[in-house]
C-alpha cells in the first residue's frame, strides 16, 4: 500500500449464500464510487440508511441499502460506504465486476480495512491483535480475552507497567549514584 491511501472494497458479511450481503468500500474514492453506481449523488447524512438503486451502465444491479460513514465516524478513519444488497451470487458477482471496473479502487486483501484503521490512529497494535483474535475466537474464553485486547485496556496496563518500571529504573540508578 505504501504511503498513498487507496480505496478498497470487500464483502464484509459472511461467506456463502444469504439473504443480505454487505460490501464495504473504504478510502478517498468511496463516495465518488457509490455516486457513480447510483447515477447521482448519495445526498444522505452520515450513518443513515437509504434505499437506492445501483446501476452499472444501463444494467440494474440491485436495490440496496446504502450507509455512508464520514472519515471521523468510520472504523477505518477513511470515507466508507456500506452497500447492503440481496445476497444472491449473481448480484454479488455483478456488483464486484462493476467495482473492479473503476480505476482508483481495488479489492481489499485480508486485513486491509484494519490496516487503514491502524494507519489512521483508529486502532493501536494491541487492538489490531485483539480484533484478529476476536474474529478467530472459537471458545467463550478466547472471546473474552480477545475483547480485553480489542477494548484497549491491555495498552493501558502495559503503559502502567512501563511507567512503574521506569520509576524502578530511576530509583536504582539514583541509589547507585549515591
Regions found by a protein language model. Name each.
Residues 1-144, 148, 152:
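A glycine-rich (often HGG/GG-containing) alpha/beta subdomain
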Residues 140-178:
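Flexible nucleotide-interacting loop at or near the entrance of a catalytic core
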Amino acid at each position: 500500500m505504501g504511503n498513498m491511501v487507496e480505496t478498497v472494497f470487500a464483502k464484509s458479511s459472511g461467506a456463502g449464500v444469504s439473504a443480505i450481503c454487505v460490501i464495504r468500500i473504504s478510502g478517498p474514492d468511496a463516495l465518488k464510487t457509490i455516486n457513480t453506481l447510483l447515477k447521482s449523488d448519495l445526498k444522505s447524512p452520515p450513518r443513515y440508511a437509504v434505499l437506492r438503486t445501483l446501476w452499472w451502465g444501463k444494467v440494474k444491479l440491485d436495490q440496496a441499502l446504502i450507509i455512508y460513514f464520514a472519515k471521523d465516524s468510520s472504523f477505518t478513519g477513511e470515507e466508507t460506504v456500506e452497500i447492503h444488497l440481496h445476497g444472491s451470487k449473481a448480484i454479488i458477482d455483478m456488483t464486484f465486476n462493476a467495482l473492479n471496473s473503476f480505476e482508483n479502487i481495488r479489492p481489499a486483501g485480508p486485513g486491509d480495512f484494519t490496516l487503514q484503521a491502524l494507519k489512521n490512529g483508529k486502532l493501536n497494535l494491541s487492538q489490531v491483535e485483539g480484533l484478529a483474535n476476536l474474529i478467530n475466537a472459537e471458545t467463550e474464553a478466547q472471546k473474552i480475552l480477545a475483547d480485553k485486547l480489542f477494548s484497549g485496556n491491555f495498552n493501558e496496563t502495559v503503559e502502567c507497567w512501563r511507567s512503574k518500571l521506569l520509576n524502578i529504573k530511576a530509583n536504582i540508578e539514583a541509589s547507585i549514584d549515591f
